[in-house]
Amino acid sequence: MEMVEEHIKGILKNRKIHFTLIDPDEQTPQEALEIAEEAILGGTDGIMIGGSTVNNDEVDETCKILSENIEVPIILFPGNINSVSKYADAIFFMSYLNSTNPYWIYGAQALAAPIVRQAGIEVLPMGYMVVQPGGTVGWVGDAKLVPRNKPKIPAAYAMSAELLGMRFFYIEAGSGADKPIPPEMVGYTKKATEDMVIIVGGGIRDGEAAYTAAKAGGDIIVTGTVVEETNDVRGKIEEITAAIRKASIE
């Protein structure tokens, strides 16, 4: 497989992207594979693996079975230093920018760096910011949650992250959020940066929300909870990816 970052930027030359987030803590590796296969049939461009409370065995077993059976990129979305697997294609090596705890801003990264190097997987440097309500990741990460009516705050953080050399910026409302990120916030964030890939997640459960996030400036739209809640993963992902593609050409 080509380098994941090159793959992502190659797709972005033509259209926006959809990733499916799978939490190994919520299903067995075999169930995760079944979800991934259905999501791929629905048009997803990649599988993210991660969660706020997973352990290494769950991540490793899930990544291994996926690597043996699917062709799209498998990207780690780590909740802590125990979320690294050599079976993944890449890792979002991220700093939790609005955490009040130095551990999440740079401590965990220092501890994880030797593990990531040893695993030999591609690194995608990313700034990460959580907006209200925040969910589990906001609580676990000791976040100073961004108010939903303050779109210029994540824009400023994204700009600073880009100046520090990060190439991805993930803005999210937390897993299972009742509302997605406000489109004004996505728009300000995109306009504040030059070449960053803007990722938007949390609270996106249907095509309309995905369309709005992509149209506002999101380069990659992430959905996770929706594949755990639906009985028709392929159909739901088809709805979402079709909306993202529509936003790409309008």
Swiss-Prot record:
Keyword Mitochondrion: no
Enzyme Commission number: 2.5.1.41
Protein name: Geranylgeranylglyceryl phosphate synthase
Biological processes annotated in GO: glycerophospholipid biosynthetic process
NCBIfam families: GGGP (TIGR01769), GGGP-family (TIGR01768), PRK04169.1-2 (NF003198)
PANTHER family: HEPTAPRENYLGLYCERYL PHOSPHATE SYNTHASE (PTHR40029:SF2), PTHR40029
Role: Prenyltransferase that catalyzes the transfer of the geranylgeranyl moiety of geranylgeranyl diphosphate (GGPP) to the C3 hydroxyl of sn-glycerol-1-phosphate (G1P). This reaction is the first ether-bond-formation step in the biosynthesis of archaeal membrane lipids.
Keyword Isomerase on entry: no
InterPro entries documented for this protein: GGGP/HepGP_synthase_I, GGGP/HepGP_synthase_sf, GGGP_HepGP_synthase, GGGP_synth
Any Gene Ontology CC annotation: cytoplasm
Compartments, as annotated in UniProt: Cytoplasm
Residues reported to bind Mg(2+): D23, S52
Keywords: Cytoplasm, Lipid biosynthesis, Lipid metabolism, Magnesium, Metal-binding, Phospholipid biosynthesis, Phospholipid metabolism, Transferase
Cofactors: Mg(2+)
Residues where sn-glycerol 1-phosphate binds: Y170, I171, E172, A173, G174, S175, G176, G202, G203, G224, T225
Catalytic function, reaction form: sn-glycerol 1-phosphate + (2E,6E,10E)-geranylgeranyl diphosphate = sn-3-O-(geranylgeranyl)glycerol 1-phosphate + diphosphate
